[in-house]
């Protein structure tokens, strides 16, 4: 989708998601899961493709320190106005989400949110975004990714689970859940979004215990073998004393 054109003509139905109660309740539930009943502040959050900042503002209200990035300056201006009206402080950055590691956005971020950018990228862009997110996310970070399934439709490409996994090779998909969002009926029938939330967590690599590793077993086997050899040579020497 050409988002620059869409904003220039005032076409941004995704902003209506904030008025969709089932969707709003679901995203609020997901935010609550990451907050884990802790008192704010909750840490740094990055809103990727923030647009006019609807969900970044919601995160800021909940006690997150939010940075929003988008390539559409008109959307960012709307976001700054919305944040001012809501009385929250959000840092809005003009930049390309496929070059996050080259953009001065700060970090590391404990939460990365994308409510509809990734799934309209081609393979190269998806992998570039995945690398950038990995570069700016903290070691204990969570990614919440809103994705339309891959199918033939106008406007939005969509992405499959395998494509999500390929773009984030150092992350584990822990949850895939319906978003409960519905477009107005004509658009819903045309686009068939059937969107889902993907929750990803960094893969942690635990070193093998030395006492259980193959090298340790090999060293133990060698030591036992050497001891047996010594004992065998000793017994042979004793027997040889009485021989003619």
Each model region followed by its residue ranges:
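Class I (Rossmann-like) S-adenosyl-L-methionine-dependent methyltransferase catalytic domain
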Residues: 1-46, 52-107, 121-136, 141-244
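Σ70-family region 2.3-2.4 aromatic/basic alpha-helix that recognizes the −10 promoter
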Residues: 110
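Short catalytic micro-motifs in class I SAM-dependent methyltransferases
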Residues: 116-120
């Amino acid at each position: 989708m050409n988002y620059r054109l869409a904003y220039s003509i005032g076409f941004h139905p995704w902003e209506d998601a904030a008025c969709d109660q089932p969707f709003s309740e679901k995203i609020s539930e997901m935010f609550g899961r990451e907050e884990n009943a802790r008192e704010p502040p909750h840490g740094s959050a990055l809103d990727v493709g923030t647009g006019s900042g609807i969900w970044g503002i919601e995160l800021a209200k909940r006690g997150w320190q939010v940075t929003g990035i988008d390539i559409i300056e008109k959307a960012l201006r709307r976001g700054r106005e919305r944040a001012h009206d809501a009385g929250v402080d959000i840092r809005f950055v003009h930049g390309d989400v496929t070059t996050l590691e080259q953009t001065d956005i700060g970090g590391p971020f404990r939460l990365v949110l994308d409510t509809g950018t990734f799934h309209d990228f081609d393979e190269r862009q998806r992998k570039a975004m995945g690398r950038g997110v990995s570069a700016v996310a903290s070691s204990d970070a969570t990614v919440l990714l809103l994705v339309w399934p891959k199918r033939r439709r106008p406007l939005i490409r969509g992405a499959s689970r395998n494509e999500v996994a390929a773009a984030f090779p150092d992350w584990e998909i822990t949850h895939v859940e319906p978003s409960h969002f519905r477009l107005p009926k004509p658009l819903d029938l045309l686009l068939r979004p059937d969107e889902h939330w993907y929750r990803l967590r960094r893969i942690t690599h635990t070193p093998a215990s030395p006492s259980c590793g193959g090298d340790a077993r090999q060293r133990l086997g060698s030591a036992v073998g050497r001891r047996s050899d010594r004992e065998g040579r000793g017994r042979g020497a004793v027997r040889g004393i009485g021989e003619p």
